[in-house]
Amino acid sequence: MGGIVCTLAFKFVNLRGFRHSARVIRGDYSSHAHPGEASPFQALSTAVSGTVGLGSIGGVAVAVSLGGPGATLWMMLAGFLGMSLKFAEVTLSVKYRRVRADGTVTGGAMYYVPEALGRVGLPRLGKFLAGFFCVAAIGGSVTIFQVSQAFAQVHEVTDFNQKFLFGLLVAVWVGIVLFGGVKRIVKWTDKLSPFMCLLYVVACIVVLAVNYANILPALATIVREAFAPHAVSGGVIGALIMGFRRAAFANEAGIGSAPMAHATVRTNEPMSQGFAALMEPFLDTIIICLLTALVIVVSGVNQTSSNVGIALTSDAFATVVPWFPAVLAIVAVLFALSTVLAWGYYGEQAWMWLFSESQRSRVAFRLFLCSMLSIAATFPLDQVVNIVDACSFCMALPNILAIYLLMPELRADLASYWQRVVLKAAPEKQNVA
């Protein structure tokens, strides 16, 4: 619903702003003189690291397993609508961010939720909801799903069965990077994100090429079962609900997590990064998730395998050559590491808002996160999915409420920005964003 409202309120900015989004990411409107710590591409890479995670592989497989192939179409629709929602929350995050005395930046829903509720005379409720959001964000930062699914795929191809050791290795690596601060995080993510996405896309294309004769029938099946009354898990409603649930987890639109990464961008024009953020749901849900679903359906493993999650995607990869799931294992580990890094940063920002920005407070969170990551692989998949959904829902409630309350302000800002920047003919670099 939030995506529909934002798409209509911003006059389909997810379509008309697509070209401008690419120009912002390219750096056409960036300047080192502006406040912030990261370039538009680096901020986007950190956010993409959090969104294009194993939800795009294992989460899609769960959706296809429980909602049928038809859930794919609803995931894509949710991704399209989520582009407008992501645009709104990222713009607000940059607009209401805080620049500390040392030049570092923090932002997110915990800053604009109190602002929104304060506008309607409910400052105390705003403060409470911001705290509620932060508690849920800290819970979500453990990213149990990522570690669990990465271990599942590594175990699938290597028979490595030490769950605690795997979690401990992830925790140690994440701890080393997190202790380096946001600059070390973006240094890793702006390299990992493009590489891991490209590797996965190429691997999926190989699977599709081997099964090329089944691509058109698979697309027809996805469309047909999205509306078929006999579809899995309650027909149309089951496919729709599962598609939207997994899409929300995959692209995080409306949850309020990615805006924390975007808040670090170097800009004095908040809306420019809102346009850059349009690309996240497009890349994650419309491209990556569609490829995952197609790989599963064209290979037929959704009908022949009893596996769920990433194990089902692995079965699809195995239809090419027996060793091909090893490629998926590499991708799974990269996706998991990048997502855990991004969410570790989100959790730390929420922790500092709740408690303190002191170094002691930061160290306490990092130790908490690493200790939880070390046992993350031991959780069963059904419990993991429920935990993820619960944290996402609790984060989305105050975030979307704030977006609704600040909608008139966003509409006015968009109209002004569109006239000043988007419609202004300037082939050379501009310093307005």
Question: What name fits each language-model region?
Answer:
Residues A33-L66, L92-K95, A101-A116, F132-V135, ...:
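Alpha-helical membrane segments and immediately flanking helix-loop junctions
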Residues E89-A101, C204-T221, G234, A263-T267, ...:
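Extracellular/periplasmic helix-exit of transmembrane alpha-helices
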Residues M1, M75-M76, G126-C134, E156-G180, ...:
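Transmembrane alpha-helical segments of multi-pass small-molecule transport proteins
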Residues M1-L54, V64-A71, G82, Y404-A433:
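N-terminal alpha-helical transmembrane segments of multi-pass membrane transport
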Residues M1-A22, A137, Q149-V154, N161-N211, ...:
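Membrane-interface loop-to-helix entry segments
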Residues M1-H20, S65-T104, D284-C289, F324, ...:
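Extracellular loop-to-transmembrane helix junctions
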Residues V24-L44, G79, V90, V94-G140, ...:
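Transmembrane-helix boundary/entry motifs in multi-pass membrane transporters
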Residues A9-N14, S56-V60, S141-Q153, V174-K187, ...:
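Transmembrane helix-loop junctions in multi-pass membrane proteins
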